[in-house]
A protein has these predicted regions:
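A shared catalytic/ligand-binding motif for oxyanion handling
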Residues: 1-168
Length: 168
Protein backbone atom coordinates (compact mmCIF):
# COMPACT_ATOMS: atom_id res chain seq x y z
CA UNK A 1 0.00 0.00 0.00
CA UNK A 2 1.52 3.30 -1.02
CA UNK A 3 1.03 6.63 0.75
CA UNK A 4 -1.84 7.60 -1.55
CA UNK A 5 -3.71 4.38 -0.83
CA UNK A 6 -3.07 4.82 2.89
CA UNK A 7 -4.73 8.25 2.71
CA UNK A 8 -7.76 6.75 0.94
CA UNK A 9 -8.02 4.01 3.58
CA UNK A 10 -7.79 6.57 6.39
CA UNK A 11 -10.47 8.75 4.77
CA UNK A 12 -12.80 5.78 4.36
CA UNK A 13 -12.17 4.72 7.96
CA UNK A 14 -13.16 8.22 9.10
CA UNK A 15 -16.21 8.23 6.82
CA UNK A 16 -17.60 5.06 8.39
CA UNK A 17 -16.56 6.29 11.86
CA UNK A 18 -14.28 3.38 12.82
CA UNK A 19 -11.39 3.76 15.24
CA UNK A 20 -9.60 0.49 14.45
CA UNK A 21 -9.10 -1.01 11.00
CA UNK A 22 -7.47 -4.33 10.18
CA UNK A 23 -5.63 -4.97 6.93
CA UNK A 24 -4.36 -8.21 5.42
CA UNK A 25 -2.03 -8.48 2.41
CA UNK A 26 -0.57 -5.05 3.00
CA UNK A 27 2.48 -5.45 0.70
CA UNK A 28 4.88 -3.42 2.83
CA UNK A 29 8.26 -4.70 3.95
CA UNK A 30 9.58 -4.91 7.47
CA UNK A 31 7.76 -4.42 10.73
CA UNK A 32 7.09 -1.47 12.92
CA UNK A 33 4.77 1.34 13.73
CA UNK A 34 4.45 4.94 12.67
CA UNK A 35 2.30 8.02 13.07
CA UNK A 36 0.40 9.11 9.98
CA UNK A 37 -1.21 12.41 11.01
CA UNK A 38 -4.59 11.41 12.44
CA UNK A 39 -3.86 7.66 12.60
CA UNK A 40 -1.21 5.33 13.97
CA UNK A 41 -0.19 2.30 11.91
CA UNK A 42 1.14 -1.00 13.30
CA UNK A 43 2.36 -3.44 10.66
CA UNK A 44 4.35 -6.63 10.30
CA UNK A 45 5.69 -8.27 7.14
CA UNK A 46 8.18 -11.05 6.67
CA UNK A 47 8.70 -12.34 3.18
CA UNK A 48 7.92 -16.03 2.96
CA UNK A 49 9.03 -18.45 0.30
CA UNK A 50 5.58 -18.43 -1.28
CA UNK A 51 4.49 -14.82 -1.03
CA UNK A 52 4.26 -11.88 1.30
CA UNK A 53 1.52 -12.11 3.90
CA UNK A 54 1.36 -8.88 5.82
CA UNK A 55 -0.99 -7.70 8.53
CA UNK A 56 -1.63 -4.26 9.94
CA UNK A 57 -3.83 -2.41 12.39
CA UNK A 58 -4.61 1.25 11.79
CA UNK A 59 -5.71 3.10 14.92
CA UNK A 60 -7.43 6.49 14.98
CA UNK A 61 -5.67 9.15 17.04
CA UNK A 62 -8.80 9.35 19.25
CA UNK A 63 -7.90 5.98 20.75
CA UNK A 64 -4.13 5.99 20.24
CA UNK A 65 -3.52 7.37 23.74
CA UNK A 66 -5.24 4.27 25.13
CA UNK A 67 -2.70 1.92 23.50
CA UNK A 68 -0.77 0.09 26.22
CA UNK A 69 1.39 -1.96 23.89
CA UNK A 70 1.79 -3.80 20.64
CA UNK A 71 3.22 -7.20 19.79
CA UNK A 72 4.38 -7.61 16.20
CA UNK A 73 4.31 -11.42 16.37
CA UNK A 74 4.92 -12.33 12.73
CA UNK A 75 3.69 -11.67 9.21
CA UNK A 76 0.34 -13.28 10.00
CA UNK A 77 -0.57 -11.79 13.37
CA UNK A 78 -0.15 -8.74 15.54
CA UNK A 79 -1.84 -7.60 18.72
CA UNK A 80 -2.55 -4.23 20.26
CA UNK A 81 -3.72 -3.77 23.85
CA UNK A 82 -5.96 -0.81 24.70
CA UNK A 83 -6.60 0.57 28.16
CA UNK A 84 -10.28 0.33 28.97
CA UNK A 85 -12.62 0.62 31.92
CA UNK A 86 -13.28 -1.62 33.73
CA UNK A 87 -11.23 -4.00 31.55
CA UNK A 88 -8.44 -3.61 29.02
CA UNK A 89 -9.11 -4.67 25.43
CA UNK A 90 -6.76 -6.90 23.42
CA UNK A 91 -7.19 -6.90 19.63
CA UNK A 92 -5.37 -9.62 17.71
CA UNK A 93 -5.32 -9.28 13.92
CA UNK A 94 -4.74 -12.55 12.04
CA UNK A 95 -4.33 -13.63 8.45
CA UNK A 96 -4.64 -17.41 8.45
CA UNK A 97 -3.04 -19.74 5.96
CA UNK A 98 -5.01 -21.07 3.03
CA UNK A 99 -6.18 -24.66 2.74
CA UNK A 100 -3.20 -25.66 0.57
CA UNK A 101 -0.65 -24.76 3.28
CA UNK A 102 1.58 -27.42 4.80
CA UNK A 103 0.25 -28.95 8.04
CA UNK A 104 3.41 -27.84 9.86
CA UNK A 105 2.76 -24.22 8.83
CA UNK A 106 -0.81 -24.42 10.13
CA UNK A 107 0.46 -25.88 13.42
CA UNK A 108 2.96 -23.00 13.67
CA UNK A 109 0.18 -20.45 13.04
CA UNK A 110 -2.00 -21.82 15.84
CA UNK A 111 0.98 -22.14 18.21
CA UNK A 112 1.81 -18.47 17.65
CA UNK A 113 -1.82 -17.53 18.23
CA UNK A 114 -1.82 -19.57 21.43
CA UNK A 115 1.31 -17.68 22.54
CA UNK A 116 -0.52 -14.36 22.08
CA UNK A 117 -3.54 -15.66 23.97
CA UNK A 118 -1.33 -16.71 26.88
CA UNK A 119 0.04 -13.16 27.05
CA UNK A 120 -3.50 -11.78 27.35
CA UNK A 121 -4.71 -11.45 30.95
CA UNK A 122 -7.89 -13.49 31.51
CA UNK A 123 -9.76 -10.39 32.68
CA UNK A 124 -9.11 -8.50 29.43
CA UNK A 125 -11.74 -8.36 26.70
CA UNK A 126 -10.34 -10.21 23.68
CA UNK A 127 -11.14 -9.65 20.01
CA UNK A 128 -9.49 -11.89 17.42
CA UNK A 129 -10.20 -10.35 14.03
CA UNK A 130 -8.99 -11.00 10.53
CA UNK A 131 -9.16 -13.35 7.59
CA UNK A 132 -9.34 -16.98 8.71
CA UNK A 133 -9.51 -18.49 5.20
CA UNK A 134 -12.01 -20.92 6.72
CA UNK A 135 -15.60 -22.02 6.28
CA UNK A 136 -17.23 -23.16 9.49
CA UNK A 137 -20.52 -24.27 7.92
CA UNK A 138 -23.96 -24.20 9.49
CA UNK A 139 -23.54 -26.95 12.07
CA UNK A 140 -23.79 -25.57 15.61
CA UNK A 141 -20.93 -26.22 18.04
CA UNK A 142 -22.21 -25.25 21.51
CA UNK A 143 -20.15 -22.47 23.05
CA UNK A 144 -18.23 -21.91 19.81
CA UNK A 145 -20.46 -21.44 16.76
CA UNK A 146 -24.12 -20.83 16.07
CA UNK A 147 -26.23 -22.55 13.44
CA UNK A 148 -26.22 -19.64 11.02
CA UNK A 149 -22.89 -20.13 9.24
CA UNK A 150 -22.73 -20.40 5.48
CA UNK A 151 -21.54 -23.12 3.16
CA UNK A 152 -19.96 -26.43 3.90
CA UNK A 153 -17.32 -26.68 6.57
CA UNK A 154 -13.79 -27.10 5.24
CA UNK A 155 -10.66 -28.44 6.93
CA UNK A 156 -9.54 -24.95 7.96
CA UNK A 157 -12.97 -24.34 9.47
CA UNK A 158 -12.78 -27.57 11.46
CA UNK A 159 -9.32 -26.62 12.72
CA UNK A 160 -10.57 -23.17 13.76
CA UNK A 161 -13.54 -24.66 15.63
CA UNK A 162 -11.26 -27.13 17.42
CA UNK A 163 -8.92 -24.31 18.44
CA UNK A 164 -11.81 -22.20 19.74
CA UNK A 165 -13.23 -25.16 21.66
CA UNK A 166 -9.86 -25.86 23.33
CA UNK A 167 -9.25 -22.24 24.28
CA UNK A 168 -12.84 -21.30 25.18
Amino acid sequence: MNQGKLEVVKQETARVNKDILRISELKWTGMGEFNSNDHYVYYCEQESLRRRNEVALIVNKRVQNAVLGCILKNNRMISVCFQGKPFNIMVIQVYALTSNAEEAEVDWFYEDLQDLLELTPKKDVLFIIGDWNAKIGSQETPGVTGKFGLGMQNEAGQRLIEFCHRTH
